[in-house]
Regions:
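Recognition helix of helix-turn-helix/homeodomain-like DNA-binding domains
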Residues: 27-44, 51-54, 68-71
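Hydrophobic protein-protein interaction segments
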Residues: 117-466, 473
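A short, Lys/Arg-rich alpha-helix, primarily the initiator
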Residues: 1-21
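Alpha-helical residues within the helix-turn-helix
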Residues: 13, 24, 54
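Conserved hydrophobic/aromatic packing and binding residues within compact polymer-binding modules
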Residues: 8, 22-23, 33-36
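Short amphipathic recognition helices of helix-turn-helix/homeodomain-type DNA-binding modules
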Residues: 47-50, 54-107
Length: 485
């Protein structure tokens, strides 16, 4: 029996109706519904599930439950939960725009007085106070270095990394995090949750460098583990229990050396989770340009807030809008040649984008994937030319658009995700407060999860169909033609 069959059977038994009545109202074949109930068949699509739910008079919560069971049974638990978690990570980038200012370390370290080399601490509040104090002490040093061996379960530590200003003195913060090596959706979900916890820190703490090793997470970290979380500074070692209610603070040079050696041994076999940086204009162009092999790949999957407008931009408009004060003439020619290559291969690119992003471009001329300082917003007539070029490419079959349903997937305005192949995923993000960021995912389970999501997206219910997307593009073109002409 599938989860969908079990869920359908549950509602059939609790609702005062018959399969015959449900079939008549929903239009779904009665025999098909009977086969669904015993797990022999699956609905042809989500629309049939919604029709059955309506016929059974399920409330919104029950309808969502039945649809969720359908999607899990249709695509498999691991695929469902992996894709659900990737969509949550994508949507969570919204929170970055509201990131608060960092706190400059204060004199809280004055509360940390130790005469003995070690001190047992009980209670979360006391441990949190000590943790914050030793982090602030290190952040106030000119050559501070913090080494961390923790998991995302230690929420308060992760909160400290997004609130204390470690950037001021360039305090190096290195973290080793265990990724679950087991197969199945629980491990995949756990590893994706790690990335979701790290994203805010990577935005706020420029000196934070997370690394991963593979192991069995449940075995290493549980309520019987002996103080598994370690925070090491120049002067202190704080060892904390899994439940974060017991800890030992060491104020001993020998203990600092011992635990630092242990950290270093793990560090020698660890790898970066991702490479994150603020690019200069040259770095941005280098990072955003795909190689010839990537451009010519059989399939390239991308998710943008807007369509990839530069690829549909005639050279005369491109040169008119580029900021020539900061982009040398030879680089301008390189940019024009690059986008000409992209245009020639666009039939192999599967791009999903939002209606909101398209409307923003048509109203303002802003291209969110390009930093504002690199160009001048496009004029109304130039916007119409680009949209017309997109429509022409859609009509002749050289471009396959998919417009995202914003009620199904939230895509932040400055976000671009590109997967030129199964081994490479790059996330571009522009923060109004922090500027341009580039996230180059390194850990393979994360790379595979994002690549799988981008491949799945164009055929999912999170986007309009190709025909619906075409109609929307034509209607937007007609709307703004009437406004600007």
């Amino acid at each position: 029996m599938t989860l969908f069959a079990d869920t359908l059977k549950k509602y059939l038994e609790t609702k005062n109706t018959t399969i015959y009545t449900i079939s008549k109202i929903s239009g779904v074949n009665r025999t098909m519904i009977q086969h669904m109930k015993v797990g022999k068949r699956m609905p042809a699509n989500a629309a049939d599930v919604s029709a059955i739910a309506k016929a059974m008079m399920l409330n919104p919560s029950e309808t969502a439950d039945l649809l969720r069971a359908y999607h899990i049974s249709h695509m498999g638990e691991e695929n469902y939960f992996r894709r659900e978690n990737v969509s949550k990570i994508i949507s969570s980038f919204y929170d970055m725009n509201a990131a608060s200012e960092l706190i400059i370390p204060t004199g809280m370290q004055d509360n940390l007085e130790m005469c003995e080399p070690l001190k047992a601490i009980n209670g979360k509040a006391n441990i949190n106070r000590i943790l914050k104090a030793i982090l602030e002490i290190e952040a106030n040093k000119k050559t501070g270095h913090i080494k961390i061996m923790v998991q995302p379960e230690y929420t308060y530590l992760f909160d400290c990394l997004t609130s204390i200003d470690f950037n001021r003195n360039q305090t190096l913060v290195e973290a080793i995090i265990v990724f679950d090596k087991n197969e199945g959706h629980k491990s995949t979900t756990y590893n994706l949750n790690i990335l979701q916890k790290l994203v805010p820190i990577l935005f706020q703490c420029e000196v934070f460098h997370p690394y991963y090793v593979y192991d069995n997470v449940d075995t290493l970290f549980n309520n019987t583990s002996m103080l598994p979380f370690k925070i090491i500074t120049s002067d202190y070692v704080l060892a904390v229990s899994y439940e974060q209610d017991k800890a030992v603070l060491y104020n001993s040079p020998d203990m600092v050396v011992l635990t630092s050696d242990t950290f270093q041994k793990k560090f020698s076999v660890a790898n970066p989770i991702c490479h994150t940086f603020h690019p200069t204009p040259e770095e941005y162009l280098q990072a955003s340009f795909m190689s010839d092999d990537e451009i010519q790949a059989e399939e390239v999957y991308e998710l943008f807030y807007q369509p990839c407008f530069p690829s549909f931009c005639p050279e005369n408009i491109l040169m008119d809008r580029l900021n020539t004060a900061i982009i040398p003439k030879e680089m301008q020619q390189v940019i024009a040649a690059y986008f000409a290559k992209i245009r020639a291969q666009y039939s192999n690119h599967f791009i999903s984008f939002t209606l909101e992003g398209l409307n923003l471009f048509m109203e303002t001329g802003r291209v969110t994937e390009i930093p504002d300082f690199m160009y001048t917003y496009l004029k109304p007539q130039q916007r119409l030319i680009l949209l017309k070029n997109i429509i022409t490419s859609v009509d002749d079959g050289s471009f396959k658009p998919r417009i995202v349903r914003s009620d199904k997937l939230s895509v932040p305005s400055p976000l671009c995700i590109c997967a030129p192949n199964e081994q490479k995923v790059i996330i571009y993000y522009f923060s109004p407060n922090k500027g341009q960021y580039i996230f180059h995912l390194q850990e393979l389970s994360l790379v595979h999860a994002f690549h799988d999501f981008l491949v799945y997206l164009p055929e999912s219910s999170m986007v309009y169909s190709e025909e619906e997307s075409k109609k929307l593009l034509h209607s937007i073109y007609d709307k703004y033609t009437n406004i600007y002409c």
